């Protein structure tokens, strides 16, 4: 035995020898240090976490093993239970509690954060905390929880942080060392399974690099054969452009990337399966499987198909027969039996977990996945395929970063199974091999803190430690640590700007030169002109809104903008004066609601008599009515469309005065004015940049503490906190807020304390709770205005009250210079209401598209949002001051947790 007796015992039980980085990290841990381990996916970081479990059990103390996802917690609980036995290992994931008093408990990070704020007795005897996937602290929504835990754990707890490879590991380790004491940073960039990079051009596979050429310099060169082939391919395309083509014929020489079945067949022939193909859209993943099913592609033997069917039946046996067709079960099953599957967050969890089990077992050979698979789920492959090097980030298509490329291709190569892993990029004419080489060669994935105070965090810190200690804690965050370091670069930027300003000023005749005065005056005129144009646009929009609200049934109007331009008749007046959207039928037979974006606000050009009921969805009715509209308008004088000037009749005395000063300025008629003005404008631009940098320096210094004080100010104003700023006290309402963990925590607390959600039936409560958790996918976070399609009047009233509370809260936030909370979103209200009432999945999913948006709700999203509603309902059940509301929340939970929502709750 050596001095590291426990490490010797631990390794003696392992079926493999420790790698060097694992040995170093475990040795540091036994010597009493905390550790930060940064290593590639699949390198074996979790061995270090498991050694912390071993040390805790050997010492008779406790270890908490935290993960960011419930699925990961379930997986780790299964692994540890198999090794140490059911009595030694517990599981806490918010909606699941198994043996919570065990010496080793696996949990989501949020559960541990909540324990810390509640001073839970379970923290007694805690010696180790393993934080798996600690790089999640960069996540905008959930990342702050990791820092809250690291900062607030008792000093004698050793933290084991396990992270993917990040380029600023030393900075991250330096921060942990500062706040946690002795911490050993272990960085290992060596992949246990070498990764080979390839490019698939048509049906030919090329190595991306020629490693023989670059070995001497240590940096491989792009494969010349690949470059030559692509050059020939592009030349063939150019020649094809010049070829005459018969009508209707294609372009025989034009390059088309291989189809998905062809790619999978090629990988199969090359012995490169199993493979994960990353497709950056859910619909694309499903379409890929459908394309493969339409081809002769089959990747499984008869024996494998029997095993696959057994797993499917075991995993999905609890699903109701009536739901199977709605879920696309039969096509999904057929894909699995042929060794093919999609994997994305829109899938039912039971389906997704079945795919993971079958792929890990080597039974499913080709998976088409979104990038979410690269985060956390243990599902390595022999090969990773990238169809594109750009992805949609919710707003626009952006190129993959080197960090994203590394994370995605990191799935290639299964330790202990594959000798090497493979990354394949599908070539398109817009892709340059050098671009792929740059992504593959760069290891830039810096960890950036997302830490920021929330209302719940603020109230808990005030309650536990008071404002002064809270300031000190916030000043120790990784966010502040990075901000303080960034100030150095900002100050250098200011100094560089000042030097350039001095040089330009010397050229122009000093910092008070007449040309600079003239340039400032010209900039002011431009600013005032822009402000006047904005005011004019707002005035026109308001005029259009007022005119829309005044329209009555039968009015004939002219739609002035957009594709629907021309005559229209009003079928139904607007319901909402604040956002009027009357229903109209155009002369081109289109029926729908228009907004101020379609209408300039001109008065109706006439009117016509309409039938009592107009079935505008029927083509025949639309045709006849459009004909009647044209006849009614035949004798009317239709005013010609005219362009409204930007100024819109506004008169701004300051603008007129500034223009006059500009014309009279001595420099105005100087020779060579434009050359001088260019330099002067450059001076003003650098001056503005410097002012912005100075504001950033001021904001970076103690920025979190100042934000915290603004939160305290707002909470004091709303009576969640009482007393002077130096000695605040949390009120009863504040204690209510302290128990709400939600992005909309303060709004929920306001709804509970004001009684906005009282008197509701269970399905109605589920509906209004969904409005504060749901966020429309790909939208602006707001659903349609609460209208007549809300299921019940009482629910509509509760939604309206919630919306009003949100509006006043957002106004207060703006007054306190706090980023406004997002508004309620009613996009899931009808869905959850119908599910709660009926348990009918088809009816619930159909309710998602009641407004005809054409964007169906996927089953996986449905389950995910149901579970978020369940989580908040559970908090309402525990925190609401009204006993009747607590009971209603409990019944609502029972109504939601059934069918597909209850199946496979991991």
Swiss-Prot record:
Enzyme class label: hydrolase
Residue span of motif DEVH box: 132-135
Gene that encodes the chain: helY
GO biological process, one term: nuclear-transcribed mRNA catabolic process, 3'-5' exonucleolytic nonsense-mediated decay
Record-annotated Helicase C-terminal domain positions: 259-463
Protein's name according to its UniProt entry: Probable helicase HelY
Binding site for ATP: 39-46
Gene3D superfamilies: 1.10.3380.30, P-loop containing nucleotide triphosphate hydrolases
Enzyme Commission code(s) on record: 3.6.4.-
Any GO CC annotation of this UniProt entry: cytosol
Pfam families in UniProt: DEAD (PF00270), DSHCT (PF08148), Helicase_C (PF00271)
SMART domains in alphabetical order: DEXDc, DSHCT, HELICc
Sorted UniProt keywords: ATP-binding, Helicase, Hydrolase, Nucleotide-binding
Organism, as annotated: Mycobacterium tuberculosis (strain ATCC 25618 / H37Rv)
Family: Belongs to the helicase family. SKI2 subfamily.
């Amino acid at each position: 035995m050596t001095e590291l007796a426990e490490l010797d015992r631990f390794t003696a039980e392992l079926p493999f020898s420790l790698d060097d980085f694992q040995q170093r990290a475990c040795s540091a841990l036994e010597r009493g240090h905390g550790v930060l381990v940064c290593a590639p996916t699949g390198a074996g970081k979790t061995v270090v976490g498991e050694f912390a479990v071993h040390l805790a059990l050997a010492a008779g103390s406790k270890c908490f093993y935290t993960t960011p996802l419930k699925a990961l917690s379930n997986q780790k609980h299964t692994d540890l239970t198999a090794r140490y036995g059911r009595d030694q290992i517990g599981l806490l994931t918010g909606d699941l509690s198994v043996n919570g008093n065990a010496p080793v408990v696996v949990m989501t990070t949020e559960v541990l954060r909540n324990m810390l704020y509640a001073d839970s007795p379970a923290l007694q005897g805690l010696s180790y905390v393993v934080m798996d996937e600690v790089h999640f602290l960069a996540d905008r929504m959930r990342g702050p929880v990791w820092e809250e835990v690291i900062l607030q754990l008792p000093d004698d707890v050793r933290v084991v942080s396990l992270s993917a490879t990040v380029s600023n590991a030393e900075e991250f380790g330096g921060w942990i060392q500062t706040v946690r004491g002795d911490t050993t940073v272990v960085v290992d960039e060596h992949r246990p399974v070498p990764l080979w990079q390839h490019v698939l051009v048509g049906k030919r596979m090329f190595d991306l690099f020629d490693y023989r050429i670059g070995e001497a310099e240590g940096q491989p060169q792009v494969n010349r054969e690949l470059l030559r082939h692509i050059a020939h391919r592009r030349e063939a395309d150019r020649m094809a452009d010049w070829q005459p083509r018969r009508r209707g014929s294609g372009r025989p020489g034009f390059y088309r990337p291989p189809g998905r079945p062809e790619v999978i067949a090629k990988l199969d022939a090359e012995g490169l399966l199993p493979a994960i193909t990353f497709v950056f859209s859910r619909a694309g993943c499903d379409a890929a499987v459908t394309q493969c099913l339409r081809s002769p592609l089959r990747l499984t033997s008869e024996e494998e198909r029997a095993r696959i069917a057994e797993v499917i039946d075991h995993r999905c046996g609890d699903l109701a027969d009536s739901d199977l067709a709605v879920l696309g079960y039969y096509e999904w099953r057929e894909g699995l039996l042929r060794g093919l599957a999609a994997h994305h967050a829109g899938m039912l969890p039971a389906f997704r977990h079945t795919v993971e089990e079958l792929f890990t077992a080597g039974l499913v050979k080709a998976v088409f996945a979104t990038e979410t698979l690269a985060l956390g789920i243990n599902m390595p492959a022999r090969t990773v395929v990238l169809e594109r090097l750009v992805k949609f980030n919710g707003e626009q298509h952006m190129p993959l970063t080197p960090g994203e490329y590394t994370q995605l291709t990191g799935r290639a190569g299964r330790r202990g199974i594959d000798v090497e892993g493979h990354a394949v990029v599908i070539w398109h004419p817009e892709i340059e091999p050098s671009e792929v080489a740059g992504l593959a060669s760069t290891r830039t994935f810096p960890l950036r803190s997302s830490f920021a105070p929330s209302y719940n965090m603020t109230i808990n810190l005030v309650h536990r430690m008071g404002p002064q200690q809270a300031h000190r804690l916030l000043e120790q965050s990784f966010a502040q640590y990075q901000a303080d370091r960034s100030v150095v670069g900002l100050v250098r930027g200011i100094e560089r700007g000042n030097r350039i300003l001095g040089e330009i000023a010397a050229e122009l005749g000093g910092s008070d030169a007449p040309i600079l005065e003239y340039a400032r005056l010209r900039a002011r005129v431009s600013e005032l002109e822009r402000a006047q144009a904005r005011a004019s646009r707002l005035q026109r929009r308001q005029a259009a809104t007022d005119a829309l609200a005044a329209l009555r049934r039968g009015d004939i109007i002219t739609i002035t903008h957009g594709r629907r331009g021309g005559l229209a008749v009003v079928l139904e007046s607007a319901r909402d004066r604040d956002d009027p959207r009357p229903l109209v039928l155009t002369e081109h037979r289109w029926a729908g609601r228009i907004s101020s974006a379609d209408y300039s606000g001109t008065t109706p050009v006439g009117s016509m008599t309409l039938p009592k009921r107009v079935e505008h969805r029927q083509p025949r009715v639309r045709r006849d009515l459009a004909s009647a509209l044209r006849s009614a308008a035949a004798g009317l004088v239709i005013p010609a469309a005219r362009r409204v000037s930007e100024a819109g009749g506004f008169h701004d005395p300051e603008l007129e005065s500034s223009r006059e000063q500009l014309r009279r300025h001595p420099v105005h008629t100087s020779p060579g004015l434009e050359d001088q003005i260019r330099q002067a404008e450059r001076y003003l631009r650098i001056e503005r940049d410097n002012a912005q940098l100075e504001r950033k320096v001021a904001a970076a210094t103690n920025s979190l503490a100042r934000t915290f004080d603004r939160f305290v100010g707002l909470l004091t104003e709303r009576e969640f906190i009482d007393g002077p700023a130096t000695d605040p006290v949390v009120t009863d309402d504040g204690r209510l807020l302290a128990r709400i963990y939600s992005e909309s925590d303060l709004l929920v607390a306001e709804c509970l304390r004001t009684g906005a959600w009282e008197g509701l039936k269970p399905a109605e409560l589920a509906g209004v709770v969904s409005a504060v958790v749901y966020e429309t996918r790909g939208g602006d976070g707001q659903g349609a205005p609460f209208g007549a399609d809300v299921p019940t009047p009482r629910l509509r009233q509760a939604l309206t009250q919630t919306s009003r509370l949100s509006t006043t809260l957002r106004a207060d936030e703006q007054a306190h210079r706090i980023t406004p909370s997002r508004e309620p979103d009613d996009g899931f209200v009808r869905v959850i209401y119908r599910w709660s009432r009926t348990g009918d999945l088809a009816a619930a999913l159909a309710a998602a598209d009641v407004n005809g948006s054409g964007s169906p709700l996927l089953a996986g999203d449905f389950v995910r949002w149901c579970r978020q509603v369940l989580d908040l309902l559970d908090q309402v059940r525990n925190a609401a001051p009204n006993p009747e509301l607590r009971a209603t929340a409990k019944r609502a939970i029972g109504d939601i947790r059934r069918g597909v929502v209850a199946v496979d709750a991991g």
